[in-house]
Amino acid sequence: MILANVFCLFFFLDETLRSLASPSSLQGPELHGWRPPVDCVRANELCAAESNCSSRYRTLRQCLAGRDRNTMLANKECQAALEVLQESPLYDCRCKRGMKKELQCLQIYWSIHLGLTEGEEFYEASPYEPVTSRLSDIFRLASIFSGTGADPVVSAKSNHCLDAAKACNLNDNCKKLRSSYISICNREISPTERCNRRKCHKALRQFFDRVPSEYTYRMLFCSCQDQACAERRRQTILPSCSYEDKEKPNCLDLRGVCRTDHLCRSRLADFHANCRASYQTVTSCPADNYQACLGSYAGMIGFDMTPNYVDSSPTGIVVSPWCSCRGSGNMEEECEKFLRDFTENPCLRNAIQAFGNGTDVNVSPKGPSFQATQAPRVEKTPSLPDDLSDSTSLGTSVITTCTSVQEQGLKANNSKELSMCFTELTTNIIPGSNKVIKPNSGPSRARPSAALTVLSVLMLKLAL
């Protein structure tokens, strides 16, 4: 009887392992056909080397170049070209912010993706690679300037924005590029033209793209206890030249102007992708990544959609592009929605406060704590344990799971209840989604191991 039970257990174990290791369990519908993104410049080179891809790419560009794009895309030849390109590396290609050939990369990206949508979309997918770094990484790099070992009373009274400017002056690259944009943005052209905004924007883009975040973030997102500090923070980008104008344009008109430029369009799409309020995360940010949101916000500075603090309030953080919703007509609701993504964005507000306080998701605050502004939730996601840092939440961590023979509902021998503990390796999370995969793109191996452990102990007990 015992041998029969052992044989049955062996058979059950074999079938369990086969089912867990089968291809159907490895590839769910959400991962089927997924390809890692390729640099669009490189993807274009690969397409050019293949005759079918290159000819179809030329055809699609001709289809999109016409005045009536929708009519052209209805053409069978255009549709065939698009279908071929969707199977090429060009379809999944992405770009890196500040890369050497960024504009060329973005032009290639939009030459494909502008043909995939009908009409104007409110939110567009970001052409940039997902951000994997966290705020805690920035804190570690900036720790030599953070004054974490200083007296809390002295630290609370200090002007953090002034300290950030001093820290920038200690770095040659930061000092050079900051002095450059200050000089250009303060240079008056004529009594009627206070500066050359185009050159000012270019100098600002160079500063935020070329200076490490541990310097730029401290100047842009420094925490303030008084109005003088908050005004210095507001003046960081020289708003009289780079931000303000005689009149505020309509926000939808400003968005339309921005989307005619590949760089501005891409930075705006990236901001929406990384700062759009999420109802399924603890912080209201996509993937609970403050760093991605702050980087996307800084990436818009120096373009038509440049955002800034609206006032010098040290407590209420409100940012906005220089625009309003006056004259929106029947588009007023859409305009207000667009503007609220800046002025009433809980993700962006929490990210700015978190950086100013020196905190990150599930990291103990080094300064005054704040109450995160929560977006209304449809389904609340529980926070991670206090002893689990954000740097490991997207990596590999160890979770110990304990079970027992009786808990499994199985009948054991008359010996004492035997508890079993086994280790599960948590999965990595694909950026921007709740789906999980293993480091080797395989399924979780914890479950077969767990089943093997449980059944082995059962076999041992039955044999005894």
From Swiss-Prot:
- Read off the Gene3D superfamilies from this record: GDNF binding domain (1.10.220.110)
Q: Which residues are glycosylated?
A: N52, N357, N413
Positions of region (Disordered): 363-392
Superkingdom: Eukaryota
Which residues, if any, are the signal sequence?
1-21
Q: Where is the lipid attached (GPI-anchor amidated serine)?
A: S444
Subcellular location as annotated = Cell membrane
Predominantly, its location class is: membrane
Q: Which GO terms describe its biological process?
A: cell surface receptor protein tyrosine kinase signaling pathway; glial cell-derived neurotrophic factor receptor signaling pathway; nervous system development
Q: Which cysteines are joined by disulfide bonds?
A: C40-C93, C95-C105, C161-C222, C168-C174, C185-C200, C195-C241, C224-C229, C251-C323, C258-C264, C275-C293, C285-C347
Bilayer disposition of the protein: Lipid-anchor; GPI-anchor
Low complexity composition bias: residue spans? 381-392
The record's annotation in InterPro entries points to: GDNF/GAS1, GDNF_alpha, GDNF_rcpt, GDNF_rcpt_a2, Glial_neurotroph_fac_rcpt_a1/2
Q: Which residues form the propeptide?
A: 445-464
* Molecular function GO terms recorded: glial cell-derived neurotrophic factor receptor activity; heparan sulfate binding
GO cellular component labels:
external side of plasma membrane; extrinsic component of membrane; plasma membrane; receptor complex
- List the keywords (alphabetical): Cell membrane, Disulfide bond, Glycoprotein, GPI-anchor, Lipoprotein, Membrane, Receptor, Signal
Q: How does it assemble?
A: Interacts with NRTN ligand and RET: forms a 2:2:2 ternary complex composed of NRTN ligand, GFRA2 and RET receptor. Also forms a 4:4:4 tetrameric complex composed of 4 copies of NRTN ligand, GFRA2 and RET receptor, which prevents endocytosis of RET. Interacts with SORL1.
Quote the function comment for this protein.
Answer: Receptor for neurturin (NRTN), a growth factor that supports the survival of sympathetic neurons. NRTN-binding leads to autophosphorylation and activation of the RET receptor. Also able to mediate GDNF signaling through the RET tyrosine kinase receptor.
Give the similarity note. Answer: Belongs to the GDNFR family.
Would you tell me the protein name for this molecule?
A: GDNF family receptor alpha-2
Q: Tell me the organism.
A: Homo sapiens (Human)
